[in-house]
Amino acid sequence: MAKNGTGGMGGSFLGKVLAGGVASVLCLIAGSAAAEVQTVRFARQLGLGYLQLYVAQDLKLVEKHAKEAGLGDVTAAYTPLGSPSAVNDALLSGSAEFAAAGIPPFLILWDKTRKSADVRALATLNSQPAYLNTNKPDVKSLADFTEKDRIAVPTVKLSYQAIILQMAAEKQFGEGNYAKLDNLTVSLSHPEATISLLSGKTEVSASFTSPPFQYQQLESDKVHRVINSYDVLGGPGSFSALWTTAKFRENNPKTTKAVLAAMDEASAFIKENPKQAAEIYIRLDNSKLAPEFVEKIITDPEIQYSTTPQNILKYTDFMARVGTLKNKPATWQELFFPELHDRAGS
């Protein structure tokens, strides 16, 4: 009796210890998952350069990969913004966890935050040409612009288009003359610039934009192309990227990997389903463009949707040389988080 009683007490005590240990482990596991954010907010610019984010939003790909990673029900929210400066402000103010814009705005933020927020890119989004279009028949090259002209870019001196214009100006006017046309630039979102250029009734006589807006502009017989960014770069190069802070990645490792997986899946979806991707873009953007028109752009061989960087150092070499960047990366990996380092980037 006594033996059985003692054994019962011991078994009960041991059971409680084991149960408590298991409960503690479960709490730790649950706590680890709960420690990561339950809402992931994306601030992005406008246009087909960010098509993966449109697709991820519509197909709930971030939510899918977060759940597969054991994070439970995570919500992804997407906010379109008209300029890269607004996108970067959203990230730094804590209004967004991820920012998506052109490569040069990312590089400038990387340069400025190396000893603070330590912003780096998680992935690129696509490689696509950007066109400088004009409604002035007599403008055949950059040398034909006058002081009366105004060139619309998303953000002066900061946006992808503004930096490419500087690179083109140096090629046109000689080394050191990269800022020769800066005084002609004005900040306008792509939709606003397109409306202004097509109307012909504003000071804007040229628009440096991106797909689909540049092709929409060229539908008018009064508009023609002056330069193509690929000609300036000497070939294709990444146009846009997705970035965040080192702190967010450190505190949310599973979420970060889920976002990258979502972008990879969205890239594959676009390649395999361009028609559906075009329909998603039109619906989410409330665009009046024809689905066939957008699909034709998406399937243009010049445009590639990929999370792997392409010719990133062409931007950094120029921007460091002219003083826009104080720090010049030796490799593209310095600009990206380790999740991307084993890919065949450039």
Show the residue positions of the predicted features.
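Soluble non-cytosolic domains of exported or imported proteins
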Residues: 81-85, 100, 155, 159-163, ...
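N-terminal signal peptide c-region/cleavage motif recognized by signal peptidases
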Residues: 29-32
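Short, surface-exposed acidic
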Residues: 71-76, 176-183, 285-297, 326-332
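Pocket-lining segment of extracytoplasmic ligand-binding domains
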Residues: 174, 182, 191-283
